[in-house]
Amino acid sequence: MKAVTTSPATEPDTAPVDVVLPCLNEAEALPWVLARIPRGWRALVVDNGSTDGSAERARALGATVVREERRGFGAACHAGLMAATADIVCFCDCDASLDPSLLVPFVREVRDGEADLVLGRRRPQGRGAWPAHARAGNLALAGMLRRRTGLRLHDLGPLRAARRADLLALGLTDRRSGYPLQMVVRAADAGLRVAEHDVPYLPRTGASKVTGTWRGTWQAVRDMRRVLAEPPAPGGVSATGSFSAPQGANSL
C-alpha cells in the first residue's frame, strides 16, 4: 500500500531537516513531542493505523502526516524516509521518551562531515524508563552487532540522523522491528562512519508497542537475528566515541 502524505497548507516547500516520527496511537504524547521539534525543521508523523485520533492531532499541531497502512515499525519508518525531501533525515520515537531537540548536535555532526550516521545512546532517567527485559534484549543485540560488524556500540536506539541519500542507498528491506538494526548493519557494511552519543531516556507515555513485554522484546530480537544473518557487503567499518548531547538545544 502506497503511503499517503497530507501537509498543512502553510508548510514551506522545503525544510533543512525532516524528522520522521513513527506513530501508533500516540495522541497523548504528540503535543510534547511536536513542541520540541527544532524551529524550521519539518515533522513527518507517520500514522501506522492509529485509532485514537493521532493523525488529526498531529495535523492540527502543524505536522505533515504520512499514512502507512502496513503495520510495522520498519514500515512506518521507511514510509517517512520515502516521504522526506530534506538533505538530512532524523528519526525519533513519538512516545515522549526522547526529546527531538537533542537531534540538533546530531544534525550538525552529519552536516559538517564528522559522521555519516549518528545514534543516540539511551541513558534512563528515573524508574521505569527502560524495563529490565528491554535492556537485556538491547545488550544482547549490541553484542551480536559487534560480532557481525565490528561496531562497538552500546545501544540501537531510535534517535538518529543521517543524509537521506545515504539511507536510500542502503536499500533497507526490513519492515518490522529489525529496521533500525538493518540501517546500522548496512551502514557499517557500506563503510559509513557511525557515531553514538548519550541522550536522556524518559519514561514513555503509554505502553510500548514493541518491548512492553518479554514476549514482545524477544520477538524483536528474533526479527533482528534475521537481519544479522544477512551476508556482509564489501566495505569498511568506522565508529566514533560518545559525548553527552546538550539538553534543550533547539536551533542550528
Set out the residue ranges of the language-model regions:
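Short loop->beta transition adjacent to catalytic acidic/histidine clusters or analogous donor-positioning motifs
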Residues: 15-18, 35-45, 53, 63-64
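Acidic helix N-cap motif at the loop->helix transition within catalytic regions
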Residues: 28-32, 52-61
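Acceptor/aglycone-binding surface of glycosyltransferases and processive sugar-polymer synthases
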Residues: 69-71, 75-83, 100-177, 204-214, ...
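A conserved acidic beta->alpha catalytic loop
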Residues: 47-55, 96
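Short aromatic/hydrophobic "clamp" motif used to bind/position activated sugar donors
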Residues: 89
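Donor nucleotide-sugar binding loop of glycosyltransferases
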Residues: 26-29, 50, 73, 99
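Hydrophobic helical membrane-anchoring modules
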Residues: 1-13, 150, 172-252
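Short, well-formed alpha-helical segments that are part of the catalytic scaffolds
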Residues: 23-39
